[in-house]
From Swiss-Prot:
Binds ribosomal protein uS19. Keywords: Chaperone, Cytoplasm, Ribosome biogenesis, rRNA processing. This is Ribosome maturation factor RimM. It comes from Paracoccus denitrificans (strain Pd 1222). An accessory protein needed during the final step in the assembly of 30S ribosomal subunit, possibly for assembly of the head region. Essential for efficient processing of 16S rRNA. May be needed both before and after RbfA during the maturation of 16S rRNA. It has affinity for free ribosomal 30S subunits but not for 70S ribosomes. The lineage of its organism: Bacteria, Pseudomonadati, Pseudomonadota, Alphaproteobacteria, Rhodobacterales. The keyword Chaperone applies. HAMAP family: Ribosome_mat_RimM (MF_00014). GO terms for cellular component: cytoplasm; ribosome. It is found in: Cytoplasm. PANTHER family: RIBOSOME MATURATION FACTOR RIMM.
Length: 167
């Protein structure tokens, strides 16, 4: 099976003719159209994408097979996935979120902190959510070189230098 990466989500219908409001997770939002066809997470549906215009909160787009507002509304919240081999290779110091999720995270002394469970981007930069055995709560860690000096995808590990935790 082809490995896929989440590249966007449908935020809802736009207009009355089946157009959708698309939220792109790609570094250049318009690049999402170049990765067509895009698939639903379960892989049961695929869409070719034609971007129509910028809209508040994303991009207006036409999806193949979506002709009415009702069909577009039914897709609200659906994530869109691209074949991994269609995505560009990244420089050495950049990573796809999908590659980081599940990696073990160790502090600079070698103690296991947990695993990356999720990654959030609220505009100011990525935040790693780390959870593991013995943790009472998740550790939210800015994904910057200061806090995460080493990412070794081949070894499946991250070395982090988190701030002191407050009790």
């Amino acid at each position: 099976m082809t490995e896929r990466v989440c590249v966007g989500a449908i935020a809802g219908a736009f207009g009355v003719r089946g157009e959708v409001r698309l939220k792109s997770f790609t570094s250049q939002p318009n690049d999402i159209a170049g990765y067509s066809p895009l698939y639903t997470e379960d892989g049961n549906r695929s869409f070719t994408i034609r971007l129509t215009r910028p809209v508040t909160g994303g991009l207006g787009a036409r999806l193949s097979g979506v002709e009415t507002r009702e069909q577009a509304e039914a897709l609200k919240g659906v994530t869109l996935w691209a074949d991994r081999d269609k995505l560009p290779a990244l420089p050495d110091d950049e990573f796809y979120h999908a590659d980081l999720i599940g990696l073990s995270v160790y502090d600079t002394g070698g103690a296991l902190l947990g695993k990356v469970r999720a990654i959030y981007d609220h505009g100011a930069g990525d935040i790693l959510e780390i959870f593991g055995p013995g943790r009472r709560q998740v550790l939210l860690l800015p994904f910057t070189r200061a806090f995460v000096p080493t990412v070794d995808l081949a070894a499946g590990r991250i070395v982090a230098d988190p701030p002191e935790e407050q009790e």
